[in-house]
């Protein structure tokens, strides 16, 4: 059990037999009355978000989420196959279980797979990945002065907005949490 005062973004808690991830939290101390914590929680199993208010000092159960390293092997007809780095056991995940991870997954990439009570609840990617641009409009001399962006298709098929100076064949860094271009690699 942990106090709601100790909640932070990304933590997982268990309420009503379901596991939730804390998306946002705000500790409020009104001028009159008791303090409280307002939270936005994401149901890990269904993806639904709820807003819940707790009294300050209230206790919640921290979910025991198991995270293990896996290597992405391949994708085939809506199934993504991963191999446990310790036991070499292979698991197959559905599109629902991998979420937006396929946008950034390359073969042989190491990821963390989170499970709760033996059920896979998500794939945790590194915060940034380096991907090759396979298709984009060519940049022209002098394009770097403007702050405009153009679409670029990456080797995974994901389309991201990049500055005009990025060309086909360039390797760029992409933030996996937001899906946005960060820099050239």
Swiss-Prot record:
Subcellular location per UniProt equals: Cytoplasm
Q: Which CDD domains match?
A: S1_EF-P_repeat_1 (cd04470), S1_EF-P_repeat_2 (cd05794)
- Single annotated GO MF: translation elongation factor activity
What UniProt keywords are attached to this protein's entry? Cytoplasm, Elongation factor, Protein biosynthesis
| This protein's record includes keyword Protein biosynthesis | yes
Q: Is the keyword Protein biosynthesis in the record?
A: yes
Cross-referenced Pfam families = EFP, EFP_N, Elong-fact-P_C
What the entry lists under Gene3D superfamilies is as follows:
2.30.30.30, Nucleic acid-binding proteins (2.40.50.140)
What the entry lists under InterPro entries is as follows: Elong-fact-P_C, NA-bd_OB-fold, Rib_uL2_dom2, Transl_elong_fac_P/YeiP, Transl_elong_KOW-like, Transl_elong_P/YeiP_cen, Transl_elong_P/YeiP_CS, Transl_elongation_fac_P
Q: Which GO BP terms apply?
A: peptide biosynthetic process
Listed GO CC annotations = cytoplasm
Pathway participation: Protein biosynthesis; polypeptide chain elongation
Q: Which NCBIfam families would you find in this protein's record?
A: efp, PRK00529.1
Q: Which family does it belong to?
A: Belongs to the elongation factor P family.
Question: PANTHER family recorded for this chain?
Answer: ELONGATION FACTOR P (PTHR30053), ELONGATION FACTOR P (EF-P) FAMILY PROTEIN (PTHR30053:SF12)
Described by its record, this protein's role is as follows: Involved in peptide bond synthesis. Stimulates efficient translation and peptide-bond synthesis on native or reconstituted 70S ribosomes in vitro. Probably functions indirectly by altering the affinity of the ribosome for aminoacyl-tRNA, thus increasing their reactivity as acceptors for peptidyl transferase.
Name under which the protein is recorded = Elongation factor P
Tell me which species this is from: Symbiobacterium thermophilum (strain DSM 24528 / JCM 14929 / IAM 14863 / T)
What is the gene called? efp
């Amino acid at each position: 059990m942990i106090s709601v005062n100790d909640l932070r973004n990304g933590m997982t808690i268990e309420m009503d037999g379901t596991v939730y991830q804390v998306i946002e939290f705000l500790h409020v101390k009104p001028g009159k009355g008791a303090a409280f914590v307002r939270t936005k929680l994401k149901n890990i199993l269904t993806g639904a978000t709820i807003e819940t208010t707790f009294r300050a000092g209230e206790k919640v159960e921290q979910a025991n989420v198991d995270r293990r390293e896996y290597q992405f092997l391949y994708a085939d007809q809506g199934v993504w196959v991963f191999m446990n780095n310790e036991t070499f056991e292979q698991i197959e995940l559905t599109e629902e279980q991998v979420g937006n991870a396929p946008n950034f997954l390359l073969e042989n990439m190491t990821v963390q797979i989170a499970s709760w009570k033996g059920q896979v609840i998500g794939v945790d990617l590194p915060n940034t990945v380096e991907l090759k641009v396979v298709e984009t409009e060519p940049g022209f001399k002098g394009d770097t002065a403007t702050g405009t962006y153009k679409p670029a298709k990456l080797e995974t098929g994901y389309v991201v907005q990049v500055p005009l100076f990025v060309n086909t064949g360039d390797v760029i860094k992409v933030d996996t949490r937001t899906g946005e271009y960060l820099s050239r690699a």
